[in-house]
Amino acid sequence: MATNAKPVYKRILLKLSGEALQGAEGFGIDASILDRMAQEIKELVELGIQVGVVIGGGNLFRGAGLAKAGMNRVVGDHMGMLATVMNGLAMRDALHRAYVNARLMSAFPLNGVCDNYSWAEAISLLRNNRVVIFSAGTGNPFFTTDSAACLRGIEIEAEVVLKATKVDGVYSADPMKDPTATLYDQLSYQEVLEKELKVMDLAAFTLARDHKLPIRVFNMNKPGALRRVVMGEKEGTLITE
């Protein structure tokens, strides 16, 4: 790669799943993975990219799962939102230890723990090269953190949502179950809907489509993949118009 190569994005929204943080543990937060992700985000900041982050909470709690067991769905989702705040606190701490300025915002007030979400404040922080972590989802039950990622991405005028997963991109079928599944380089929003490909839930996906927000799905477990994505190299699957 030429040394004078420049990033293809100025501002991104990085969506991390809670499961990505748990590593091989199966639950909770793997400190080594957290630190590696913080280092990869630091690389982006050093390239001059403005970074917003949304983290899921599935490594700690899943509201939908307990709803099936009889818990009120609203209560379960509130607990799931708090799980994303816990992950956000861990990520902010990891970024601070990596000497990266980061701010944690919550969709609902948690005074003394983190800041309330403010669109204007978030934009100002991003312009000053601060990483902004958006937690507590959208602040409403029944909406996933993928919906939160697309919503915040649109609000902060990110050029792309980078969805970090455990696989190399979007496949024609589940690569864990079907060895013949093929990896797509690029898809249109329409193709994703027609082929019924699982990229993110429909509410999140249609929000991105309606606002022409591109989505790139890539494997966060592959070292250097995030950097390759922002440098415009062949990595993952791009979904656009």
Curated annotation (Swiss-Prot):
UniProt name for this protein: Uridylate kinase
Q: Which organism is it from?
A: Cronobacter sakazakii (strain ATCC BAA-894) (Enterobacter sakazakii)
Keyword terms: Allosteric enzyme, ATP-binding, Cytoplasm, Kinase, Nucleotide-binding, Pyrimidine biosynthesis, Transferase
Free-text function comment from the UniProt entry: Catalyzes the reversible phosphorylation of UMP to UDP.
Q: NCBIfam families given for it?
A: pyrH_bact
Q: What is its EC number?
A: 2.7.4.22
Q: How is its activity regulated?
A: Allosterically activated by GTP. Inhibited by UTP.
Q: Does the keyword ATP-binding apply?
A: yes
Q: State the PANTHER family in the record.
A: URIDYLATE KINASE (PTHR42833), URIDYLATE KINASE PUMPKIN, CHLOROPLASTIC (PTHR42833:SF4)
Report any Pfam family annotated for this entry. Answer: AA_kinase
Q: Please tell me where UMP binds in this chain.
A: G57, D77, T138, G139, N140, P141, F142, F143, T144, T145
Q: Where is this region: Involved in allosteric activation by GTP?
A: 23-28
This protein's GO CC annotations: cytosol
Q: List the disulfide bonds.
A: none
